[in-house]
Amino acid sequence: ILGGVDLIRRVHGRPAWALAWPLLTAPDGTKLGKTTGARIWLDPDRTSPYQFFQHWMNTDDRQVRQFLAQFTLLPMDEVDAAVASHEESPGRREAQRLLAREATRLVHGADDALAAEEASAILFGSPIDGVSVAALEAVAREVPVCEVARGDLAAGVPAADLLSSPNFLTASKGEARRAIAQGGVYVNGERVGEEHVVSADSLLHDRYVLVRKGKRSFGLVRLEA
């Protein structure tokens, strides 16, 4: 660091300053970094706003106050109030949500932060009523996507056919049918039966259909452009 400061002074003839920051460590003292799987990038092409948001959502309870103080511009009285509320109901992870929201807003802007938070809620089981286009586009960057022609969807596509589309949610139509028969397939949050047909009526914002298999396996059907 000092070498870089000196090089700038010698080459450009003007002073430079360096900022040093204490190493981030896990509660057990392990350094947080790429070797521990904790690497994130500011570049949205390397770490999407959704992934960035989730990184902060996964903050350990023991460190959430520290990170709120270090990585947001919130007043400390607001930080302390959030932590106190979190300690009363830790399962709701409200302090982590505040940290994720503020850190993502600072790096990616308010719109992407809101879309990332909404996408996170969807992918963790919240109802999709009123879901925004931006949130669905954020989801599309994180889950398998099945492109469907408008004409095919207008005619109706059996749910099993969609699930077994190449690189989507099941490896075969038989697996898709079994998942549906067992009650484990949802279209736009509603459980579907063996005869269910996905049609244009299912479209969200005239372009997307959200499909879930089991508790956490999501896919997005998207109309071809």
Roles of regions detected by a PLM:
Residues 1-6:
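Internal alpha/beta core interface subdomains
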Residues 8-225:
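Conserved nucleotide- and phosphate/pyrophosphate-binding catalytic cores
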